[in-house]
A protein has these predicted regions:
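Residues forming the flavin
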Residues: 1-153
């Protein structure tokens, strides 16, 4: 099994940078998540952000990617890296959208985001990078079973 190298990327877009201390989240990923490479970006889902991740995959040997940004259901095309294990920490919908935007709630919101980063780092480390089974070949044929009218509607 090849060595794994984990990288964490924290997005500042979509209100994340205004509500959270993203530099502190980068430090949490490095210290508590034990991630050797952690960075933040203004908008991870734009071309520059995706290029930064792809560059690290190509040049730094990153095999596992943890993205702290929006929901794993959003921006799936932007964060599709077929050769790498990818985990998403849902900071937008899971943290800042459900917490009040008040001074009293700011500290607990930050703590919640830090927990999400810790969980994302732990999740991606437990993943196996996709690669298929090297012992079997691939096949382009498909068998459809039960393709009746009920299954088509």
């Amino acid at each position: 099994m090849a060595d794994i190298k984990v990288a964490a990327y924290i997005c500042k877009g979509c209100g994340l940078g205004e509500r959270l201390d993203t530099d502190a989240l980068v430090k949490i990923a490095q210290k508590d998540g034990k991630v050797p490479l952690a960075k933040s970006h203004e908008f991870l889902c734009n071309a520059d952000g995706v290029a930064m991740i792809k560059n690290d995959i190509a040049n730094e040997g990153v095999t596992h990617v943890m993205i702290g940004a929006c929901s794993r259901r959003a921006k799936t095309e932007a964060f599709f890296f077929p050769e790498n294990a990818v985990a998403r920490a849902n900071l937008r919908e899971g943290v800042i959208w459900i917490r009040p935007d008040t001074d009293e709630a700011r500290e607990t919101t930050q703590e919640m985001a830090e927990d999400y980063i810790r969980m994302g780092c732990a999740e991606v480390k437990a993943m196996t990078a996709p690669g298929g089974n090297p012992n079997t070949g691939s096949s382009k044929t498909l068998l459809v079973v039960g393709g009746g009218v009920t299954g088509m509607t």
